[in-house]
Each structure stands twice: as C-alpha cells, then as structure tokens.
Amino acid sequence: MFLLVALAMTNSRNKGLRFELQVAHLIDDELGIKLYRDLEQTRSADHGDLISSDPSWPFVIECKRYAKGYLPKDDWWQQVCTASKLVRKIPILVYKFDRLPIRVRVPISFVQLLKGEHDWRYYTDMDFPTFCYLAREQLA
C-alpha cells in the first residue's frame, strides 16, 4: 500500500515538474522571456512555480496539471494570490487537465490594465495564446 502511494506521489510530482518546464518553454517561445523553476517552492509555502532572473518581471506564475477536471480549484487561485501579494506582483495561474488545452487565470485588472489597488476576487480565464497577447502588451 505504501509503495503504491509513494509511486503515485512521485508520478504526480513528475507530471507537475514536466508541466512547469513546458510552460516555461512556451513563455520563452512566445515572449522571449526565460523562466526558471523556483526551488524555494519545495521548501516553503507562498512561492510561485516559475520565476525570472529579471526583477522587473511583473508576474508570479503557479502551474497546475491534473488528470481529471475542467475548472481550477479555488485554493489554487488563493495560493498564487497569496504569493503575489507578498512580492507585489500579478498572480498568474496556468492549469491543464488531460485532453483539454492549457488555460490561464489572471485578475480582471490585468485584462483591463487598471492601475492602483487590485481586487483579486475578480478574475478571468483565457487560453494560452490570449495570455501571451496580453502579456506582450503589458511588457511593452
């Protein structure tokens, strides 16, 4: 029984790692920005999965990859919002379920490009190409 649980956890961890690397590669392809896995995420809470060596990078990115489902869990969004508030950056949740395309959740203020305080109770989900379009506009 323990071996089965350990194998499932290892496979799950590997699946998450592969997805993080896939997202980093896609962002590099689309935006020309190199992202790296934040190794602090494994040691302490309230860290995103992907970071940039550029301190002006405005996002905290959390990646979630699951077999079943179609909508992200509320605690995934809370996790990335908590990490983002600590470093005053924009929360980005990139998620994928088996046989479905990659989706991205961002706060609505990101889409509207609002300035000032952020109310992260409001958000939008979009496909990955739409996220890259908006990210290019934000970075310009």
Regions found by a protein language model. Give the residues of each.
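Catalytic phosphate/metal-binding cores of nucleic-acid and nucleotide-processing enzymes, i.e., regions
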Residues: M1-A140
